[in-house]
Amino acid sequence: MAQGEVLEFEEIVRTRQDALLRTPPGLVPDPVDAQDLLQTALARTYGRWEGIADKRLADAYLRRVMINTRTEWWRARKLEEVPTEQLPDARVEDSTEQHADRALLMDAMKVLAPKQRSVVVLRHWEQMSTEETAAALGMSAGTVKSTLHRALARLREELETRDLDARALEREERERCAAA
């Protein structure tokens, strides 16, 4: 690779580092896996940097590599048990309530199919447009919209179920205390 292209790649990584660091925790629950995912995506992208015609789409290319790598990992680990208690660390500036909400949402996202989860992460956490998300995932804008609609409906359903379960437990506890 020519020195100019190496510098160009380094500059993109340096200037887009905050955005790049936000994507992996939405794709994999373990913070260590998230770091590995980003590292792998950067290494793979670096190896193919000369072949990328439009360098302005580097973010989308890197996200696509992360999604593909995550999919490869899931296929390889398909038969292994996935721990549900591991959640990514929240940023220090989050309040306790925001941290709890984020942890609840991350846990609830585990019910989504990988494609649905990818669409939710790119559209809502990365705040990509429908068209950008479609390009990053290699699908049509209509598919992004319908997948997002189904994913959000499934998340609402999951969160409502959890809320009803929590209320039932609170009611049982009050009844137990009143009877004692």
Curated annotation (Swiss-Prot):
Residue range(s) of DNA binding per entry: 130-149
GO biological process: DNA-templated transcription initiation; response to stress
Entry's localization field: Cytoplasm
Primary location group: cytoplasm
Any GO molecular function: sigma factor activity
Gene Ontology terms: cellular component: cytoplasm
Keywords assigned by UniProt, alphabetized: Cytoplasm, DNA-binding, Sigma factor, Transcription, Transcription regulation
PROSITE patterns per the UniProt record, alphabetical: SIGMA70_ECF
Family membership noted in the UniProt record: Belongs to the sigma-70 factor family. ECF subfamily.
UniProt function note: Sigma factors are initiation factors that promote the attachment of RNA polymerase to specific initiation sites and are then released. This sigma factor is required for the synthesis of the antibiotic actinomycin.
Protein name: RNA polymerase sigma-E factor
Gene of this entry: sigE
